[in-house]
């Protein structure tokens, strides 16, 4: 295998006969043809048929090879890069596969650029072969072949100390209890009438104790090993007459180091219909154990107990995978089949008895170090932003500010807007070169200084800008110019609640009281301890790949409500948020929904948030329009509003919608 990092094949068009000749090393390739195969979302596969200059293909000359490259879709590529999927698969074929043999395709070339996500794998073609069918299930003979080959893969690496320390193989899982709970809520909302009562018990017990389950299975006394991570029939190719191998395992992007019996349990839980599994279960466990080899550090009883404990992995995969991939009719049938069979596996082995007690995760809090600026990674859409708002109902004035640093585009965005029911909307919307100092920047038209003067307690903003005034704020969504006017914000945000850190991404929110001065032309406002919010966010942010509704609301009784409902095309919506009482107690929210209507100008007319629920009466509009480098456009209608809860409590706050438009060139 060649690992030429300097020469990554990004697309099939990059292939040449000379390159294929060198990579395969089986003689001069005179010509080749390319055929797309498979429908993967994170990567793309192509069959490359080869014509040799000095003779036909033979035993040492493959007739065809398979090229695997990163997805062309930028969102999919960023996801694959951020999760380490591309690096894992390349490193597996380069570092681990040569030690194993067995059901693994030969690799002729493997390379990855971890700064861009470009990668390639040139693999032996598994054909002629038949892919397994998760819904129909395997025959007993196929299941026996699969567990034997899996045992031969696992055996040489059980307890390997070097692999246990390899950073690329031991990335922390992003999944935890706070993440799986809202995914399960969406799962029940979609499939609830198809879930048997006894299977719902399994799911609810797992979700309620998920963090404890993960900690329990990562304990030092649990033997660790190589995990394919998705060892199921859809990733197994059964060789037919003329194939080089009886079985080929594909899609190693989820390879990791973890509980050794996970793959076996996942396979046994669903590869056979429930009654067939029960009939052949013990024989399949024995076949796997024997395939581990005579020096395996596991007894047959150890294998059975490990499979029992890991039977929940399949339940988790049925819930999570169904909520994160594009919905299809076959997908629905497959996920319901998975859930039924894996839950039966849990019940048949009495695995519920191994779960720890249910627990509610404590809300996360940011550290003082989180208030600092962060070093960017190489992802093109990595950004860091600081946001702060206020709403002064007595004076009819609301405002917000955001500084966004898009490091790898060498650009900074500054937004500062003021609005109210009896005033035009004022907007400073500026793009400038990335500053050397993230805390101070300016041009002839604005000066900005900001700082967390007391980390997690006090944040200060000093802004002077030549803004634009709009009697019709929807003009901002159309990119139109307004009337020039000077404005300033000299404000301090003092923390008025518990700082809240997201679990799913690097971001935190802080409810505040805001004081200071604002000027609009010759008009001065004195802001005295009014409700507000601030947040700080850093990481890969593609605002043009999803829609959302965000809110930060503050009630007169001291309650703070925050929620965001994110809507990604092809996936169910999911939510993050909290309710904080005046006593400092924080309750995390799993469901945040909204009902809103928009005018033809793109501004919200009215809305209801379903987190209390809350009715919203818009007091001022302060929208922005964001255009990506590739022409994609997002409209951000933003409004501050008076709010009323169902039980009559009142307050104020800000609401934001992100609404993506078709790409355009500006």
Positions of predicted regions on the chain:
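Juxta-kinase regulatory segment immediately upstream of eukaryotic protein kinase catalytic domains
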Residues: 1-32
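Active-site acidic catalytic loop and adjacent metal/ATP-binding pocket
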Residues: 39-55, 66, 210-260
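Conserved ATP-binding subdomain of kinase catalytic cores across diverse folds
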Residues: 44-46, 51-52, 57-178, 261
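Active-site activation/catalytic loop segments of kinase-like enzymes and analogous catalytic loops
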Residues: 91, 254-295, 311-331
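ATP-dependent phospho-/nucleotidyl transfer catalytic cores
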Residues: 130-228, 239-242, 334, 338, ...
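C-terminal hydrophobic structural anchor segments
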Residues: 285, 289-327, 598-634
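ATP/Mg2+ or Mg2+-diphosphate-binding catalytic cores
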Residues: 309-359
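Structured soluble/peripheral alpha/beta segments that form catalytic or ligand/cofactor-binding pockets
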Residues: 359-666
């Amino acid at each position: 295998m060649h690992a030429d990092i300097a020469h990554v094949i990004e697309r099939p068009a990059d292939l040449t006969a000379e390159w294929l000749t060198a990579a395969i090393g089986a003689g001069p390739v005179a010509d080749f043809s390319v055929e797309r195969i498979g429908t993967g979302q994170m990567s793309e596969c192509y069959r490359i048929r080869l014509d040799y200059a000095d003779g036909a293909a033979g035993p040492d000359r493959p007739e065809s090879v398979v090229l695997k490259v990163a997805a062309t879709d930028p969102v999919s590529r960023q996801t694959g890069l951020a999760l380490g999927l591309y690096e894992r698969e390349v490193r597996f074929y380069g570092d681990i596969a040569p030690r194993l043999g067995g059901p693994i395709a030969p690799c002729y070339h493997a390379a990855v650029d971890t700064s861009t996500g470009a990668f390639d794998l040139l693999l032996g073609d598994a054909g002629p072969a038949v892919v397994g069918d998760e819904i129909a299930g395997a025959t007993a003979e196929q299941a026996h072949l699969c567990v034997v080959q899996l045992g031969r893969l696992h055996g040489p690496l059980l307890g390997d100390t070097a692999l246990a320390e390899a950073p690329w193989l031991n990335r922390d899982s992003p999944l935890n209890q706070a993440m799986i709970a809202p995914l399960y809520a969406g799962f029940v909302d979609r499939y609830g009438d198809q879930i048997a009562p006894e299977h719902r018990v399994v799911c609810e017990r797992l979700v309620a104790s998920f963090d404890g389950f993960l900690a329990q299975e990562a304990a030092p006394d649990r033997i660790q090993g190589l995990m394919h991570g998705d060892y199921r029939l859809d990733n197994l190719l059964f060789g037919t007459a003329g194939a080089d191998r009886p079985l080929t395992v594909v899609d190693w992007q989820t390879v990791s180091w973890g509980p050794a019996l996970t793959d076996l349990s996942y396979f046994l839980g669903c590869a056979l219909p429930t009654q067939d599994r029960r009939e052949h279960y013990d024989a399949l466990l024995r076949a796997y154990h024997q395939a581990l080899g005579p020096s395996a550090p596991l007894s047959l009883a150890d294998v059975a107990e490990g499979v029992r404990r890991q039977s929940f992995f399949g339940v988790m995969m049925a819930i999570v995978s169904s909520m994160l991939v594009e919905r299809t009719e076959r997908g629905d049938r497959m996920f319901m089949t998975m859930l039924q069979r894996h839950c039966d596996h849990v019940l048949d082995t009495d695995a519920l008895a191994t779960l720890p007690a249910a627990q509610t995760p404590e809300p996360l809090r940011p550290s003082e170090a989180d208030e600092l600026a962060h070093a960017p990674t190489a992802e093109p859409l990595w950004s860091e932003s600081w946001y702060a708002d206020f709403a002064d109902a007595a004076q009819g004035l609301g405002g917000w500010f955001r500084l966004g640093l898009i490091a790898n585009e060498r650009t900074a965005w500054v937004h500062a807007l003021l609005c109210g029911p009896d005033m035009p909307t004022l907007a400073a919307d500026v793009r400038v070169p990335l500053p050397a100092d993230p805390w101070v920047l300016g041009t002839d038209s604005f000066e900005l200084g900001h700082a967390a003067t007391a980390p997690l307690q006090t944040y200060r903003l000093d802004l002077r800008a030549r803004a634009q005034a709009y009697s019709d704020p929807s003009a901002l969504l159309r990119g139109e110019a307004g009337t020039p006017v000077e404005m300033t914000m000299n404000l301090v945000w003092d923390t008025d609640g518990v700082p809240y850190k997201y679990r799913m991404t690097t971001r935190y929110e802080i409810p505040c009281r805001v004081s200071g001065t604002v000027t609009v032309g010759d008009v001065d406002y004195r802001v005295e301890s009014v409700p507000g919010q601030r947040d700080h966010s850093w990481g890969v942010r593609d605002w043009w790949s999803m829609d959302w509704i965000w809110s930060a609301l503050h009630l007169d009784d001291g309650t703070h409500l925050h929620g965001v409902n994110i809507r990604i095309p092809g996936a169910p919506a999911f939510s993050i948020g909290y309710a904080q009482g005046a006593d400092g107690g924080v309750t995390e929210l799993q469901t945040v929904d909204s009902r809103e209507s928009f005018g033809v100008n793109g501004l919200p007319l009215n809305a209801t948030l379903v987190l209390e629920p809350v009715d919203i009466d818009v007091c001022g509009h302060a929208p922005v329009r964001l255009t990506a480098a590739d022409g994609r456009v997002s409209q951000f209608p933003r409004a501050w509003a008076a709010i009323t809860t169902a039980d009559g409590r009142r307050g104020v706050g800000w609401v934001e919608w992100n609404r993506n438009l078709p790409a355009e060139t500006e």
